[in-house]
Amino acid sequence: MGLGMWLRTGVLMAFLTGLLMAIGYVLGNETGMMFAFMFALVMNFFSYWYSDKIVLTWYRARILEEDEAPELYEIVRGLAQEAGIPTPKIAIVPTETPNAFATGRNPKNAVVAVTQGLLRILNRDELEGVIAHELSHIKNRDVLIQTLAAVMAGAIMMVARWAGWMLWLGGFGGRDRDRDASGALGAILLIVLAPIAAMLIQMAISRAREYLADETGAKISGKPWALARALEKIEHAVSMRPIKNGNPATAHMFIINPFRGVSFAELFSTHPPTQKRIERLRKIAENMGIAF
């Protein structure tokens, strides 16, 4: 992992640790902040080593053996060779909402996850376009920071909600009446600000990485038009059937935001507008001398 990726990962972990410590301070002054710091250290450790497994578990994704999906493995292996990276494992997500994401801490430990719905609505060319996009995230070393952000943001949202309820119920002892009187306000701030912080973390991952993955993926597959058609199909399907049981903290990991129109997450755009992505793919095709 290069110096730039180490720096980005370190900044992300430091920011998330600081946010957890701030929550701890609101709840229990210096003692609460110290407990939050210890919790953050544990979370950072487990997030680095196990975040990919955590994300796959959230979506009940199952690793496929090659004999279960030989054609899919053939596509992934060929594109991975073209990209110059090891062939990642493939996971299937049991939902009819078409989408895909990549996870893992490095190219040697990567997984490309696709939904049942994606395999159902895309033809082979379009599927190659999507797979190439996800392999680009692996090649460009985006997957580690994307996965860390998803797990840590999810943890922050969970802790803040739990802390908010405890403040409402007066579950933290040892505080004076002034602190108790401020409990309701603290709970409101935690409940409101935690989802905002989680969405800001996703935005900080940089929407530019999606443009880069589109461009790199188009060059890997040699079919920018196929990726454009796939994006149109996925966008339409997600607008009709968004994922309802997933974790909004993972929105930035998917090729298209799967939570469109179903939650507070819609206020924060984790992806560039699909139409702009298609227009950029059109220009890429022209530069490659390929009909669009």
Swiss-Prot record:
The keyword Methyltransferase does not apply. Its EC number is 3.4.24.-. GO terms for cellular component: plasma membrane. Keywords: Cell membrane, Hydrolase, Membrane, Metal-binding, Metalloprotease, Protease, Transmembrane, Transmembrane helix, Zinc. The keyword Cell inner membrane does not apply. Pfam families: Peptidase_M48. Binds 1 zinc ion per subunit. GO terms for molecular function: metalloendopeptidase activity; zinc ion binding. It is found in: Cell membrane. Zn(2+) binds at H133, H137, E210. The active site is at E134. HAMAP family: Pept_M48_protease_HtpX (MF_00188). This is Protease HtpX homolog. It comes from Thermococcus sibiricus (strain DSM 12597 / MM 739).
